[in-house]
């Protein structure tokens, strides 16, 4: 097999596309194939820095890891980073090219389509298989004219399409049927079959519904992946970051006490994955919060990154969270700001890049000033600590103590521009010891055996195992080798 490719589309956002692609990459590598992930266009503020010094979606970095590859801009040539409700920063081949309004995006389509086609063609020449991920859902037919990642990509590259859906949300059979039904006949012809994700219970109870789905659509279901609560790292979509929701699956504490973490769910949150390493720790309970009352009883408050720092800072004040964070810090308890969250902790922010508000006061918990530069900083660090930087804001003045060469601190208030910092196991353990001491949690015991990197690989191995055990892998390999088989067109009122 050389240059085989398929597209994993979804009934909705957060249906399981990213993890299915990652699991397929890991499984095919196990089978001796060279594999690359590909997402033509991603809309996400969860991003990573590549070996070329560019920027791609974090999910594609995870999928590259699954395939045994370093992250590359080739795997996600178009990245849209929403900074407001109607505009996004446009990143092409890893570099910012400007901002684009949703209504104007169609004017860029031809150029971007050529970039996508070039990168996919190159990957197909270099790898045995390319596993592509769609965006959102192909059922969003209002976006078909500008689509580069779903059926627009599949039609341009003649890719067979597998549609995956999350049955845990309910209504999946209707979603699968309807997704195919609303497509144009030429797009329908590429949809080869379905995958059911996150099924709880006895799969035999689902069998009659899948048989009827096959009769209605003329397409098989390649398998049913069971729900598994260990698969939660590297969340792709902000829809997964729900206010009040727990991060991960909390493990029992090693000592007599737990640590409670309140992570602020900013409206324009970016790189929410930074806090996942905390949730890997036994006895650490991490919850997304949006109200000042939710800070009560927290041992640690985390302000994550933001694609609109000044706007989200104003939101903190409007929600009463700014005052709550200040009170938390005044009580001597720990606060961590990452990237945009770090900038919010400072005294002043001068931002002519992402905001029209100019110079504004920060929370003042760190005596430092931030100035935004037009040129974005993109850095990937490996030694002695590993992490990466993606930011316009620069520290212009500081009267605070340096924190490990990667940030600033005042007492138990910490700030850093580094994403992925808490993935460094030894640093995280030492820092959690400080956090517990500041909170008076003498009965909290930091585990000495948590390896976040190994946990990520174990998750990818688990996803590959689930695919191998529950999907028709032979049929999927046939799609890669032979393309889309003939499938009937579904006649609906849309196509009459």
Swiss-Prot record:
Molecular functions per Gene Ontology: ABC-type vitamin B12 transporter activity; catalytic activity
Similarity comment text for this entry: Belongs to the CobB/CobQ family. CobQ subfamily.
InterPro entries noted in UniProt: Class_I_gatase-like (IPR029062), CobQ/CobB/MinD/ParA_Nub-bd_dom (IPR002586), CobQ_GATase1 (IPR033949), CobQ_synth (IPR004459), GATase_3 (IPR011698), P-loop_NTPase (IPR027417)
Domain GATase cobBQ-type stretches: 258-427
Source superkingdom: Bacteria
Protein name per the record: Cobyric acid synthase
Cleaved signal peptide residues: none
Single biological process term from Gene Ontology: cobalamin biosynthetic process
SUPFAM superfamilies tied to this protein: Class I glutamine amidotransferase-like, P-loop containing nucleoside triphosphate hydrolases
Cystines in this chain: none
Pathway: Cofactor biosynthesis; adenosylcobalamin biosynthesis
Annotated function: Catalyzes amidations at positions B, D, E, and G on adenosylcobyrinic A,C-diamide. NH(2) groups are provided by glutamine, and one molecule of ATP is hydrogenolyzed for each amidation.
Catalytic residues, chain numbering: 339, 419
Gene3D superfamilies noted in UniProt: 3.40.50.880, P-loop containing nucleotide triphosphate hydrolases
Lineage, opening ranks: Bacteria, Bacillati, Actinomycetota, Actinomycetes, Mycobacteriales
């Amino acid at each position: 097999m050389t240059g085989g490719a398929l597209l994993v589309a979804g009934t909705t956002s957060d249906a399981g596309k990213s993890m299915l692609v990652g699991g397929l990459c890991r499984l095919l590598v196990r089978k001796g194939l060279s594999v690359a992930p590909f997402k033509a266009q991603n809309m996400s503020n969860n991003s990573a820095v590549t070996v070329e010094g560019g920027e791609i979606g974090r999910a594609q970095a995870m999928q590259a890891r699954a395939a045994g590859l370093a992250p590359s801009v080739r795997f996600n040539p178009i990245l849209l980073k929403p900074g407001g409700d109607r505009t996004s920063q446009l990143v092409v081949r890893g570099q910012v090219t400007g901002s684009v309004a949703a209504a104007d995006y169609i004017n860029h389509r031809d150029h971007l389509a050529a970039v996508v086609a070039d990168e996919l063609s190159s990957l197909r020449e270099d790898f045995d298989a390319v596993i592509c991920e769609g965006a959102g859902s192909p059922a969003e037919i209002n976006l078909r004219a500008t689509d580069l990642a779903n059926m627009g990509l599949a039609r341009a590259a003649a890719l067979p399409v597998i549609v995956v859906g999350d049955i845990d949300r309910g209504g999946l059979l209707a979603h699968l049927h309807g997704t195919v039904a609303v497509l144009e006949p030429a797009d329908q012809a590429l949809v080869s079959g379905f995958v059911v994700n996150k099924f709880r219970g006895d799969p035999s109870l689902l069998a009659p519904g899948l048989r009827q789905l096959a009769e209605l659509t003329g397409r098989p279901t390649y398998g049913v992946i069971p729900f598994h609560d260990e698969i939660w790292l590297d969340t792709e979509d902000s829809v997964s970051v729900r206010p009040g929701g727990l991060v991960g699956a909390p493990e029992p504490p090693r000592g007599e006490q737990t640590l409670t973490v309140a992570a602020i769910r900013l409206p324009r949150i970016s790189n929410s994955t930074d806090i996942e390493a905390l949730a890997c720790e036994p006895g650490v309970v991490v919850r997304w919060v949006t109200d000042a009352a939710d800070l009560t009883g927290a041992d640690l408050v985390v302000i994550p990154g933001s694609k609109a720092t000044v706007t989200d800072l104003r939101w903190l004040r409007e929600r009463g969270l700014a005052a709550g964070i200040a009170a938390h810090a005044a009580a001597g308890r720990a606060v961590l700001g990452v990237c945009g969250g770090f900038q919010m902790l400072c005294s002043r922010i001068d931002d002519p890049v992402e905001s029209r508000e100019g110079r504004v006061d920060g929370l003042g918990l760190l005596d430092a000033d931030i100035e935004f530069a037009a040129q974005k900083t993109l850095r990937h660090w490996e030694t002695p600590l590993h992490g990466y930087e993606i930011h316009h804001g620069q520290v212009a003045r500081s009267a605070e103590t340096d924190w490990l060469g990667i940030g600033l601190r005042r007492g138990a208030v910490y700030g850093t521009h580094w994403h992925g910092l808490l993935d460094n196991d030894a640093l995280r353990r030492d820092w959690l010891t400080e956090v517990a001491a500041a909170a008076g949690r003498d009965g909290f015991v930091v585990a000495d055996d948590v390896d976040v990197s190994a946990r990520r690989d174990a998750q990818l191995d688990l996803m590959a195992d689930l695919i191998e055990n529950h999907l028709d892998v032979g049929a999927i390999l046939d799609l890669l080798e032979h393309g889309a088989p003939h499938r009937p067109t579904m006649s609906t009122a849309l196509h009459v």
